[in-house]
Amino acid sequence: MRKFFSMRFPSPVSVQWLADFLGAGLVGDKNGQATGINEIHKVEQGDLVFVDHPKYYDTCLRSAASYIIINKAVEVPPGKAILIVDQPFEAYLRIVHHFRPFEPAAKMISDSAVIGRGSYLYPNVFIGHHVTIGSNCLIHPNVTILDHCVIGDNVIIQAGTVIGPDAFYYNTKKDRAVWYKKMASCGRVVIEDDVEIGAGCTIDRGVTGDTIIGKGSRLDNMIHIGHDTVIGENCLFAAQVGIAGAVRIGNGVILWGQVGVSKTLTIGDNAVVLAQSGVPSSLEGGKIYFGYPAEDASVKKRELVWIKRIPELWKKVMAGRPEEGRPKAH
């Protein structure tokens, strides 16, 4: 079972310090130590989260998160603390920018990057700050690997691919001039061992956690993987597959060309989705799917056969009706 990492602070941070830093009211366990900041769907003990809508108060308070930035005084569960501010989203941004500040790049390969033995980088490869690349990797021209991303051993990345751009993820409020405010992305991309990624792909970093490509997987050209998506081992994706954010894909999954996968769903182990299918909801493993919405391929193909026969069947139906009962042409 994979462990999903949040953005960790360099060392545990006093919740009292956080309250002072944010100018927040502090209620609950005032002696706690926050270890990192995370999203609500994958928090763990010691994590800090924010919530700014009553709809999600209860979810946050009942989650594993130890510390909640919130915009209303509420009853605090035992062992937790809340930090009360007017704008929790802005407080989240302040914390992220403090612990993960912007670092200008002065070189094509950062001095803080670690590159393993036997790895070869073609000309015009950009390697950001605090990137780790394993042994015996081959990174083709014009690849960009942005800050804090992790590349395993024996990985091949073809030309023009970008690893670690910001998540397409926004705080949305329509009562302000700018409806969509950018969520600062402080997560990573982790490419495990023995992965090959084709040309012109983009793999977004997690908002606070990791986007993961599992060991032995193969990605064709021009594929997009959204933030916080976790892809299992030995998966095979053909060209122009698009996967939205926070998707969980099992081991041995095959997605053929131009398959589109919607956000926050799960595809089970060894599922196969045929070309140009759309996946709007979770799929069980071990089956072959086709169409939009993607369904069992054998059922979908039979449906298509019957759809093609509609004109023929319509003629037969009309041929058996009396003249006065037939619909009139307009």
Model-predicted regions and their roles:
Residues 1-107, 111-112, 154, 160-161, ...:
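Terminal amphipathic alpha-helical/low-complexity segments used for targeting or macromolecular assembly
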Residues 50, 107-296:
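Structural signal for interior beta-strand "rungs" in well-ordered beta-sheet cores
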